[in-house]
Swiss-Prot record:
Annotated family: Belongs to the methyltransferase superfamily. RsmH family.
Superkingdom as given in the UniProt entry: Bacteria
NCBIfam families: 16S rRNA (cytosine(1402)-N(4))-methyltransferase RsmH
HAMAP family: 16SrRNA_methyltr_H (MF_01007)
Cellular localisation: Cytoplasm
Organism expressing this protein natively: Onion yellows phytoplasma (strain OY-M)
Protein name: Ribosomal RNA small subunit methyltransferase H
Length: 304
């Protein structure tokens, strides 16, 4: 098969591909198509196999269809990865040889001011990965209660002054643009670890797109889909995602016996963890690609 290459720099790309242990005849899922970085690498290694690449962002799917050569064994599926089992079942696919999750924003989302993900441009507060959904960041800021806003900022952003920020947002309503929100974060949020709005925007984005709940659902579904010896590879970009992945792997790789139960042979667990500690980018990669600095890669294998 002729190889195809793109300039987009995917984080931990080679490491993720190596951990997947691609079989030329295997069936794989790239749960986060993005700008095709991992998708193209996986597809280049397939011969009789096939790859299903998911993305809930219609722009990402449209762009991929324009640039991916027709000869590659890929189907692009416009869907949130929380619908893995349903979407694959519609295609009579019930078992996978591996699945990759590259979580977080893609460059095309960050770099397009009109999408509303960035606090560096004065644009409408949108933040939807799926533009067909109705809930936007602007709706949340102008309609959620004080308690709801405080909880979002505290849990999803780990913001220390969550109550103060929530209270000021309610006072300043309506908020329409990113700079309306930045004016508040500049007053109440710590700038020591980057821009004052960073954690607030992260929290809103997670709420708008229900990112953590979708991840939990997708991980559970992947457990049912993976064949014995199939790999699950997850790249996360903040502690909330990583915590979910770490807990999921641990929960499914340990078996706790009830006290005094007379069992001498331990049952087999669904997963075995390959990366005992999260795999981190090299110093060279972090220097060449600043987006990789917060990345953590975790891998597990499905037991037979």
């Amino acid at each position: 098969m002729n190889k195809t290459h793109f300039n987009h720099i995917s984080v931990l790309k080679q490491e993720a591909i190596d951990f997947l242990k691609i079989k030329p005849e295997g069936i794989y899922v790239d749960a986060t198509l993005g700008q095709c970085g991992h998708t193209i690498e996986i597809a280049n290694l397939l011969q009789q196999g096939f790859l299903y690449s998911f993305d809930q962002d219609v722009e990402a799917c449209t762009n991929a269809k324009k640039i991916l050569p027709p000869h590659l064994p890929i189907e692009i599926i416009h869907s949130n990865f929380s619908h893995l089992k349903t979407q694959l079942a519609q295609r009579n696919v019930f078992q996978l040889d591996g699945i990759l999750f590259d979580l977080g924003l893609s460059s095309c989302q960050i770099d397009n001011p009109q999408r509303g993900f960035s606090y560096l441009h004065n644009t409408p507060l949108d933040m939807r990965m799926n533009v067909n959904q109705t809930i936007t960041a602007q709706y949340i800021l102008n309609n959620y209660s004080f308690a709801q806003l405080k909880n979002i900022f505290k849990v999803y952003g780990e913001v220390k002054n969550a109550a103060l920020v929530a209270s000021e947002i309610i006072k300043q309503r309506p908020l329409c643009t990113s700079y309306d929100l930045v004016a508040i974060t500049d007053r109440f949020c710590n700038r020591q670890k980057g821009h004052s709005a960073k954690k607030i925007f992260q929290a809103l984005r997670i709420e708008v797109n229900q990112e953590l709940e979708s991840l939990k659902q997708a991980l559970e579904q992947s457990l049912d889909l993976l064949k014995p010896n199939a790999m699950i590879v997850v790249i996360s970009f903040h502690s909330l995602e990583d915590r979910i992945v770490k807990h999921f792997f641990k929960k499914n790789s340990t078996f706790v016996l009830p006290k005094k139960m007379p069992i001498t042979i331990m049952p087999q667990t669904p997963l075995s963890i390959i990366t005992k500690k999260a795999f981190l980018p090299s110093e060279e990669e972090m220097q060449n690609n600043s987006r990789s600095i917060s990345a953590k890669l975790r891998v597990a294998v499905k037991n037979g």
